[in-house]
């Protein structure tokens, strides 16, 4: 199979997991209960753990390898600042789409990076795709629940999944010979994800007199550790 078709399929699947997460949220008709509340908090922290693993094992290591100290610091801090400004802007708008916007804000640069690194290192490309898929599932689940006033929630998530192949193919053709730009984008995304985790996800892990939900973060990070282990 031509490499570009592999990129299209892999990046599309990575985006489709957000839709799968939304479908799970849609078919959930159970009554609110302590168990359900723990599960929902656990899904949130699972996504946080996977995001941290993506930063630790896929995004920042590429920046450390390809960038000197100053560009590395600038891109990482810029990513955090950009997500901070986006978060502030959404709060001013009182937007019910913060989780969905955050999903797109980290998915698109990651997909561009996926396409860019695939030509030089398909193994890293598949590894990055696995991280994107794992993080998009709980993000899609949470985004669907957040968009409770929107009548076309699944359509939005399906449309978001199609942005993956577009971004990945763009990265493949435009950035495959620009490893430093690709590494900068990955580090930028890493900084943004770190902001997202500690601003939005970690505070939601706290549930009074319940101690299991934060273990979702450990499980999510373990998924990343196992991916790194088997990749090597």
Predicted regions and their residues:
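Intrinsically disordered, metal-sensing/regulatory segments
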Residues: 1-232
């Amino acid at each position: 199979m031509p490499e570009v078709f592999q990129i299209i399929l892999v990046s599309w699947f990575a985006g489709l997991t957000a839709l799968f997460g939304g479908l799970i949220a849609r078919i959930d008709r159970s009554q609110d209960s302590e168990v359900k509340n723990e599960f929902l908090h656990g899904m949130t922290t699972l996504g946080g753990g996977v995001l941290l693993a993506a930063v630790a094992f896929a995004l920042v290591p590429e920046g450390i390898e390809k960038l000197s100290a100053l560009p590395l610091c600038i891109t990482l801090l810029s990513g955090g600042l950009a997500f901070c400004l986006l978060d502030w802007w959404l709060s001013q708008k009182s937007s019910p789409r913060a989780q969905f916007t955050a999903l797109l804000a980290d998915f698109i640069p990651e997909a561009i990076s996926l396409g860019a690194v695939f030509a030089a290192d398909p193994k890293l490309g598949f590894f990055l795709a696995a991280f994107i898929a794992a993080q998009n599932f709980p993000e899609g689940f949470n985004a669907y629940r957040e968009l409770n006033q929107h009548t076309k929630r699944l359509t939005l998530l399906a449309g978001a999944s199609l942005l993956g192949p577009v971004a990945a193919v763009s990265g493949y053709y435009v950035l495959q010979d620009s490893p430093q730009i690709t590494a900068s984008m990955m580090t930028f995304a890493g900084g943004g994800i770190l902001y997202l985790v500690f601003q939005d996800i970690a505070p939601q892990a706290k549930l009074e007199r319940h101690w299991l939900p934060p273990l979702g973060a450990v499980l999510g990070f373990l998924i990343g550790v196992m991916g790194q282990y088997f990749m090597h």
